[in-house]
Amino acid sequence: MYHFFVDRGQVNAGKVWIEGSDVNHIRNVLRMRPGEKLDVSDGSNTIYHCEIDRFEECQVVCEILSSEESYAEIPAQIYLFQGLPKADKMELIIQKAVELGVTAVIPMSTSRAVVKLDAKKEESKIKRWNGISESAAKQSGRTFIPQVEPVLSFKQAVERMQPLTHKLIPYELCENMDETRRLLYTIKPGESIGIMIGPEGGFDKDEISCALEHGIMPITLGRRILRTETAGMSVLSVLMFLLEQRTC
C-alpha cells in the first residue's frame, strides 16, 4: 500500500487533500486512478486508509474509509548526531536511521571530518537529505517524517544534547560491555536519547574530553571497529529492540 504524508489541516470532514510534489507522483509516476487505495499519515499516530475520489489541478482528493492508531514509532525520541562522512554515505545513514525509528538526524562538523560544507552547499545537502528522509519514512510506514537539521559544530551538538534524558557516545577505547549494557537497560519508553557518532577516523581526544565533561556517556559497540555508517545503525537497532520489547 502506498503511503503519503499531509499536514493535519489537510484532513477534514472525512476527506484528505494531498498536495505538493506527491500530486504529480500519484498521477503521473504511479498512474493511480480514482477508486484506488492508499494510506495517509498526518504527523500523529493515526493512519488513514483512503480511496482516491478525484484529481484536481493541484490536489488529490481522497475519501477516508477508515483509520487506526499506528504502533510504527519507537516509544522514545532518538536523535542521531552524525559526524559528516565522506562521499554519499550520509544518504545511506539517513535512509537506514529513518527505517530504524530515529526522531531526527543532526549532522556534525568535527575535527576529523574531511567534508566541509559552505552555506550554499549545506542548504542544498539538507534539502536533499530531507527528501531521502521522506522517502524512507514512506517506505517504512512511519507516521511522521524525521527532520534532518542544519549542520552543527561539535560544541553546538554537545549543547544541543544537554536537555536529553540519555546522552551516549560510542568510543573505541571504551571496553566495559557490562557498563554499556547497564546504561542501555536504564532507558525507558517516553525518554529522549542522543547518540553521537564520529566521522571516518572517529573523535579526537579533545572532543571526547568535552563530551565526558558535559555528561555524555561513553559506550562500547563490541570488540570490532565499525565504520561510521554502521555504528549509528548498531545503536539504533539495539534501542529499537529494547524499547519495543517493553511495549509490544
What kind of region is each of these model predictions?
Residues M1-E69:
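N-terminal positively charged helical leader segments and presequences
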Residues Y71-L168:
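RNA substrate-binding interface of SAM-dependent RNA methyltransferases
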Residues K205-C248:
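Structured adenosyl-cofactor binding patch, chiefly the S-adenosyl-L-methionine
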Residues L38, E63, E69-F81, L184-E191:
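Mobile, glycine- and charge-enriched loop segments
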Residues E122-I126, T186, S237-V238:
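Short, hinge-like loop/turn segments at secondary-structure boundaries
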Residues L164-G202, E207, I216-I219:
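Active-site/ligand-binding-proximal alpha/beta "capping" segment
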Residues G9, S67, S109-R112, R223-R224:
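Short, ordered loop/turn segments at secondary-structure junctions
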